[in-house]
Amino acid sequence: MQPLHGNCLIAYARHKYILTMVNGEYRYFNGGDLVFADASQIQVDKCVENFVLVSRDTLSLFLPMLKEEALKLHVHKKVPSLLVHHCTRDIPVFQEVAQLSQNKNLRYAEMLRKRALIFALLSVFLEDTQFIPLLLNVLQPNMRTRVCTVINNNIAHEWTLARIASELLMSPSLLKKKLREEGTSYSQLLTECRMQRALQLIVIYGVSIKRVAVSCGYHSVSYFIYVFRNYYGMTPTEYQERSAQELPNCGSAASMAAQGIFYGTDRSAEGIRL
């Protein structure tokens, strides 16, 4: 089968379990082992019932939740192709994640829940010193992801091109050039990050429009509403009303988001203990 570059795999061994590497090597695991691996190094067709494939897009959403210092690490030339965390108790959500991952026609609330549960599983490995190097090795984040990580860690800050470049240990001109090569700019990414955070605060937490504006770095509520309408095609209030009608049963996803599992908060870096 084709190598799955840019994707990761999470496997859970309920009993003794074997993974086959692409080089023909067999890796043996005991019951209770949770495995995080570079999917391109695993023959995933051998373990369909026991794994969740995490796409590059999902990994790219998880990465900005981490502190920006993590992205200053150099991608290691020698990192393991997989990590193992032995869980002292069963993981009931794993089967649910696996089932959701196999469903190609998920409702919006189900998509949120699947992503939240995947992030929860990924957080198990946060205390492993090899986790971030392996994640970066697989994902090799582009400049867009690095910039968004910096912005999301302090969304209300008055960011400038020079300040972001300083956080990423490069010159403003080099940062501008790299972003241009990726078809974007720091101002565009700043707006995207703030609008995404605004949507989270409005839809998930029900925060007032004035507080959302301040939390997202806007000193003028009217200007915030103007930017929001240009970005989403409707005002914050209109979006809130529409979401309330479309997502009456998303309490589970919202609850997980409030605990810092789905969206980037300081608590998300603490992970969960199993």
From Swiss-Prot:
Alphabetized UniProt keyword annotations: Activator, DNA-binding, Repressor, Transcription, Transcription regulation
Span of domain HTH araC/xylS-type: 145-242
Induction of synthesis: Expression can be activated by RpoS and repressed by CRP, H-NS and GadW, depending on the conditions.
Zinc is among the record's keywords: no
Gene Ontology CC entries for this record: cytosol
Pfam families linked to this entry: HTH_18 (PF12833)
PROSITE patterns reported for this sequence: HTH_ARAC_FAMILY_1, HTH_ARAC_FAMILY_2
One GO MF term attached to the UniProt entry: transcription cis-regulatory region binding
InterPro entries according to UniProt: Homeodomain-like_sf (IPR009057), HTH_AraC (IPR018060), HTH_AraC-typ_CS (IPR018062), Tscrpt_reg_AraC-type_HTH (IPR020449)
Residue range(s) of DNA binding per entry: 162-183, 209-232
Keyword Nucleotidyltransferase in annotation: no
Assembly and oligomerization: Homodimer.
Record's function text: Positively regulates the expression of about fifteen genes involved in acid resistance such as gadA, gadB and gadC. Depending on the conditions (growth phase and medium), can repress gadW.
Protein name: HTH-type transcriptional regulator GadX
